[in-house]
Swiss-Prot record:
Textual note on the cofactor: Binds 1 Mg(2+) ion per subunit. Binds 1 zinc ion per subunit.
Family as reported in the entry's similarity comment: Belongs to the PRA-CH family.
Naturally occurring in which organism (per UniProt): Delftia acidovorans (strain DSM 14801 / SPH-1)
Identification of the protein by name: Phosphoribosyl-AMP cyclohydrolase
Keyword annotations of the record: Amino-acid biosynthesis, Cytoplasm, Histidine biosynthesis, Hydrolase, Magnesium, Metal-binding, Zinc
Cystine bridges: none
Co-factor requirement: Mg(2+); Zn(2+)
Gene Ontology CC: cytoplasm
Gene name for this UniProt entry: hisI
Keyword Hydrolase: yes
Binding site for Mg(2+): 79, 81, 83
Annotated compartments: Cytoplasm
């Protein structure tokens, strides 16, 4: 069990989860925010691809299992408090890569302008054609 000690250093929340930020390795773009449980983080490190925990479905979610938009993980980092994980990834699927279920490059596609949220990044692929 010695090899898994690094997992014990993570400060899991009351539900056994840790917040995760996926950041594109080459551009620095923040792609998405999600959650991982212990099993998801262990599988991510083992497989070199992002595996998250879906709170709504209460199960592991292999990023790209439905869309084909896989995240290859190059590096797993943890913050100074050991309670947030950062994945340095390469996002695949319809260049420049689609991370968001809306068909956009990043889940952070809206900006606050004049007191309103405005979508500023384009839809790269219609989500209807992604999730069949």
């Amino acid at each position: 069990m010695q090899a898994m000690n690094w997992l014990d250093q993570v400060k899991w929340d009351a539900q056994g989860l840790v917040p995760v930020i996926a950041q594109e390795k080459d551009t620095g773009d923040v792609m998405m925010f999600a959650w991982m449980n212990r099993e998801a983080l262990a599988k991510t490190a083992e497989l070199g691809r992002a595996v998250y925990f879906s709170r709504s479905r209460n199960k592991l979610w292999f990023k790209g299992e439905e869309s084909g938009h896989v995240q290859t993980v190059h590096e797993v980092r943890i913050d100074c408090d050991n309670d947030v994980v950062l994945l340095k990834i390469t996002q695949t699927g319809h260049e420049p890569g689609i991370a968001c279920h809306t068909g956009r490059h990043s889940c952070f596609y809206s900006v606050l302008r004049d007191g309103q949220w405005q979508a500023v990044d384009p839809v790269l692929k219609d989500p209807e054609s992604i999730y069949k």
